[in-house]
Amino acid sequence: MTLKPVREVSPGSQEGEERLEQSLRPATFEEYVGQEKLVENFRVYAKAARARGEALDHVLLSGPPGLGKTSLAHILARELGVALHVTSGPALVKKGDLAGLLTALAPRDILFIDEIHRLSPAVEEALYPAMEDYRFDVVLGAGLGAQTMEMKLERFTLVGATTRTGLLASPLRDRFPIQERLGYYEPTELREIAVRAARKLALPVDPAGAEELARRARGTPRIAIRLLQRARDFAQVEGDGTLTREIVETTLERLEVDGRGLDAMDRRILAVVLDTFGGGPVGIDAVAAAVGEERDTLEDVYEPFLVREGFLARTPRGRVALPPAYAHLGRERPQGKQGSLI
């Protein structure tokens, strides 16, 4: 079996990171950096629900991975003074898995379902009456003799997190009274996140080092923390233990992360579109085959950053390389290449 190398600039969570993320996770709204309007809204929602002694309305958090959706769920539970029960869409295989979680909830508890867009149809359907009427229907028997037994549930809050809102069925999406989308972070916010994390790790940080790390973290706190970990290793072994600009630059050079935050696979994707397919338009399946990746991985992990930074465009005819892609890879743009997005 061939193991793929760990990708330091992947926004998705990687094996073994959960414990560190928990230790660095903000504990309160005051500690949460970025997403100011969203955080202020949740501060009001949580305070009002707690004052009334009610469960918070169901919440849907959407946005790219690594932006703090799980951290928000933890903070909400702490602010409300209730327990947080964590699971994920792929982990809920059958209705019984969901029943076990729902019946264990105390009044006003929060059930957090990550990747909620990956729920099976059967589990999703069973969730509807639980969200609306706080009941779970159990079917006893089969065929014409089947009977439905209704199990009453405590009033709870479902917090769903998704990176792909478009994959949610409308009946599920419409059952969330509170829907908020997290956006990418500014370099100044990522710098503050990196400095706070370094303080918890007892790592001295030079302001220029934190600024350089934040600039290349692709607008994503999870990536900033991951790069900070790797830079800490280089600071300890090849420096004096301080995170300086030179140490950060050395770290990212060794990880093949360039000045725009692109890694080797990002550059390979751009090179394929430019060199193999003449800059496009080219279908995503052709690109996936050329770089040896799954289509879904390209669409969910790699493309969002390349599109956001203006290297690629998604068009009805396929992917098209934009002028910054030619410039970044040092390619001459073919004469007469208009880069039409139509």
From Swiss-Prot:
Q: Which residues bind DNA?
A: 295, 314, 319
Spell out the residue ranges making up region: Large ATPase domain (RuvB-L): 1-185
Which reactions does this protein catalyse? ATP + H2O = ADP + phosphate + H(+)
Q: What positions does the entry give for Mg(2+) binding?
A: 70
UniProt-listed SMART domains: AAA
Give any single GO term for biological process.
Answer: DNA recombination
**Which CDD domains does its entry note?**
AAA
Q: Does the keyword Cell division apply?
A: no
- Could you give the subunit structure recorded for this chain? Homohexamer. Forms an RuvA(8)-RuvB(12)-Holliday junction (HJ) complex. HJ DNA is sandwiched between 2 RuvA tetramers; dsDNA enters through RuvA and exits via RuvB. An RuvB hexamer assembles on each DNA strand where it exits the tetramer. Each RuvB hexamer is contacted by two RuvA subunits (via domain III) on 2 adjacent RuvB subunits; this complex drives branch migration. In the full resolvosome a probable DNA-RuvA(4)-RuvB(12)-RuvC(2) complex forms which resolves the HJ.
Entry protein name:
Holliday junction branch migration complex subunit RuvB
Specify the species.
Anaeromyxobacter sp. (strain Fw109-5)
Q: Name the gene.
A: ruvB
